[in-house]
């Protein structure tokens, strides 16, 4: 029987600043690196052999995985990176402070954007100041400007079913 271990990336610079991150390719904080080390130590205590790793194309996720693998002394060459595992795209909210957005639009509206299954945040404008921070490894025809949780589900689940679950 195979095990599936899910680990969220460590704290990023924008997590710390309470900014919507989504597809913006933002680095880990030192605390985030420590969180990844701690996750690696917990996995090591379980004495589970890692055969395959999957990560998004976002450097905070890739760096978290690399830190974990270093703790495990695992020179795993079977690392699969895919933009299809990226976090949800927060559209126009990307890079904005969550508290400021709540003040501007109200807690109820922000919760609708964040928690509704089929409601997307406003789409990212072509002149958005964070446009250049969006992950670059996405085929142009697949690039979106916002995602609902449903959109994210419809992107991630087929990847899981085709690439991860068969292992």
Tell where the protein language model's regions lie, with residue ranges.
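Short acidic/His/Gly/Ser-rich catalytic and metal-binding motifs that mark active-site loops
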Residues: 12-17, 122-124, 133
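Loop-to-helix element that buttresses phosphate recognition and phosphoryl-transfer chemistry
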Residues: 11-67, 142-158
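Short glycine- and Lys/Arg-enriched binding-loop motifs that mark or flank ligand-binding interfaces
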Residues: 6, 18, 28, 87, ...
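Short coil/turn segments at beta-strand junctions that form active-site/ligand-binding loops
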Residues: 2, 48-51, 166-167
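Long, compositionally biased
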Residues: 129-140
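Active-site-adjacent alpha-helix immediately C-terminal to a catalytic or transition-state-stabilizing loop
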Residues: 4, 62-63, 70-76, 150-167
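Short, hydrophobic/glycine-enriched beta-strand segments
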Residues: 3-9
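Phosphate-coordination/substrate-recognition cap region in phosphate-metabolizing enzymes
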Residues: 38-131, 145
């Amino acid at each position: 029987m195979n095990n599936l271990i899910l680990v969220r990336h460590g704290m990023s610079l924008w997590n710390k600043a309470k900014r919507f991150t989504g597809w913006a390719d933002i680095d880990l904080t030192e605390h985030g690196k420590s969180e990844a080390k701690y996750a690696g130590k917990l996995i090591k205590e379980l004495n589970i052999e890692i055969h395959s790793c999957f990560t998004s194309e976002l450097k905070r996720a890739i760096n978290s995985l690399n830190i974990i693998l270093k703790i495990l002394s695992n020179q795993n060459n079977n690392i699969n990176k895919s933009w299809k595992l990226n976090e949800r795209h927060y559209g126009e909210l990307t890079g904005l402070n969550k508290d400021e957005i709540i003040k501007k639009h109200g807690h109820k509206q922000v919760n609708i954007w964040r928690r509704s299954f089929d409601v997307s945040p406003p789409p990212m404008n072509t002149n958005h100041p964070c446009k250049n921070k969006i992950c670059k490894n996405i085929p142009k025809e697949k690039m979106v400007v916002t995602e609902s949780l449903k959109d994210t589900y419809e992107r991630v689940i087929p990847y899981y079913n085709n690439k991860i679950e068969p292992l």
